[in-house]
Amino acid sequence: MATSLGSNTYNRQNWEDADFPILCQTCLGENPYIRMTKEKYGKECKICARPFTVFRWCPGVRMRFKKTEVCQTCSKLKNVCQTCLLDLEYGLPIQVRDAGLSFKDDMPKSDVNKEYYTQNMEREISNSDGTRPVGMLGKATSTSDMLLKLARTTPYYKRNRPHICSFWVKGECKRGEECPYRHEKPTDPDDPLADQNIKDRYYGINDPVADKLLKRASTMPRLDPPEDKTITTLYVGGLGDTITETDLRNHFYQFGEIRTITVVQRQQCAFIQFATRQAAEVAAEKSFNKLIVNGRRLNVKWGRSQAARGKEKEKDGTTDSGIKLEPVPGLPGALPPPPAAEEEASANYFNLPPSGPPAVVNIALPPPPGIAPPPPPGFGPHMFHPMGPPPPFMRAPGPIHYPSQDPQRMGAHAGKHSSP
């Protein structure tokens, strides 16, 4: 198609002339006082190849100049920014948004079909108020939980930084701090994020950024319904003391008929039983990881049947295939009972024998005057039984091999010996 302003082509009346671009907050920049240049029919759109009005501006200090890449018609068809081609509502690539909304917009890619499709869409846009997307995206009214979790609504201004200086990478940059490009090490060329195509992002195919986000979404926790279709009970945890049965009923009644609500105040949880399985599945899907009642986030899970809980008790120590597992050898047994108060007071940290009074030594004293001494041993009858070993509390303490093992030297009884 000829792009000369003087040529009279059949599509000349469809050239775009706009007064302000359609941009996201990140591309626009953080500076509210921005200077922007406008050039009518400055370039052709990279999607529909029609001339359009190009806007160019600098989003901030030490940032690179940015400009619009696609026309406003292509931007309105996909509800994306004219520069970065990210969704204006969620800040996500088109491929992620379409996957979250569960629809695929098959736009024509050949020249003739693309022009015909664009003209029809422009007519539809002119008949609308211009604030809502048209086409397949305008018909998708339902929102997705995945999009709400992955949404990037906070501006990320580092995306506007200059590109890496190729001369600095080769060691030949002589500008120093005056160089408008970044002096940083480039990313790995084998990294998928290093190869991005604007057309692939617009059509939602082979987008490496979208693939990374979709992989992250696949690893998010999910609440799968149990295989037992008779389970219609949901477990709600983390109630606290402020949430009552009425608060739970006011939230869950919208999903279907509620049979019973049992609140266990001691455990701060509740069990909500629905009349039908479908109502329980809808309630679990709409409430998992996003239920907030009275400013408190609650935990929602599926309840378990009594039969399943009984099987778990029976299968204790048994694998799924029915093999009985032996206990692991070498594990320590039960811990001994705690020491008594007297033993704690003694502070016997090294299992030393308790210290007591010195052992009594049987020393023969001279008999008083006027009394005959006893006969020597072996010549007379035994008057007394020989003494046995002294009791434990009378035994002398065992030898201490190292001074550090003596609790008396380690300050265990410092309070007793310290002067008042």
Swiss-Prot record:
Role noted for this protein: Required for pre-mRNA splicing as component of the activated spliceosome. Involved in the first step of pre-mRNA splicing. Binds directly to the internal stem-loop (ISL) domain of the U6 snRNA and to the pre-mRNA intron near the 5' splice site during the activation and catalytic phases of the spliceosome cycle. Involved in both translocations of the nuclear SLU7 to the cytoplasm and the cytosolic calcium-binding protein PDCD6 to the nucleus upon cellular stress responses.
UniProt entry keywords in alphabetical sequence: Acetylation, Cytoplasm, Isopeptide bond, Metal-binding, mRNA processing, mRNA splicing, Nucleus, Phosphoprotein, RNA-binding, Spliceosome, Transport, Ubl conjugation, Zinc, Zinc-finger
N-acetylalanine PTM positions: 2
Protein name: Pre-mRNA-splicing factor RBM22
InterPro entries attached to this UniProt entry: Cwc2/Slt11 (IPR039171), Nucleotide-bd_a/b_plait_sf (IPR012677), RBD_domain_sf (IPR035979), RRM_dom (IPR000504), STL11/RBM22-like_N (IPR048995), Znf_CCCH (IPR000571), Znf_CCCH_sf (IPR036855)
Residue ranges of domain RRM in the record: 232-305
Matches recorded under SMART domains: RRM, ZnF_C3H1
Residues with PTM Phosphoserine: 4, 102
Record cross-link Glycyl lysine isopeptide (Lys-Gly) (interchain with G-Cter in SUMO2), residues: 139, 149, 290
Domains (record comment): The C-terminal RRM domain and the zinc finger motif are necessary for RNA-binding.
Location of N6-acetyllysine modifications: 212
Localization per record: Nucleus; Cytoplasm
